[in-house]
Amino acid sequence: CFESIKDAQEYMPEFLDDIIKRNLNCIKFFKTPDNQIPFFNGGSQTSLVQFEKYLENFKLIKNRKKNCIGGIFYAKSKQQVLYFDIGNPPDKNFSNNYQSGPLSFEYFLDGMKIITNCGFGNNISTKAELISRLTASQSTLTINDTSITKFERNKLVNRIFGNSIKNTFKAFDLEIKNDKSFVGCSSLHNGYEKNFNCIHKREIYIDPGVNGLIGIDHIFKKSDGIPIR
């Protein structure tokens, strides 16, 4: 779009130029070592090789100074890369591709994906697409095979909004750590509060010293904060 307007020697509105640059920066932020995007919230196996060539020609500087964009935390140390979903679910009107995987993650080592999340089911059966959105399909903790987010099954509603979500949750208490020992963060979500009266906390860190990944899941009682053993 930007190049087409430029070649046509048309006036580029400042707001449009800003929107294009912001979107390109997001693509740069999310591009994985294998030239794809993380498999969160509608992400599927899509090569960005040709798109990356365009970005290089566009001479856009990759900005990795931010730790988080769009609810996805990013960390890198040497040959390790971590993507961590710490965001809240979108508004119902924009949730037709949402995957119910709060605190799910993907991990790369030496350019290879070691831990993957479930990609969104494109061009498959309706049932398989729904399965690809359930919590049990994601790289996160599940309790009693329960999907944290419920999906709308009403055909009329789905015709208007797509297969949108019916309920929501909150992610909170993000704590980022970035020192010589560990690079990563911890976060909580209350998706299991209504049915199980508990809070899920996940800590996940890259260890630069040993090229390793360290993580731990906590389940706390909502009423008193005591860990469930």
Task: Locate the predicted segments by residue.
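Long, well-ordered core segments of solenoidal/helical folds
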Residues: 18-35
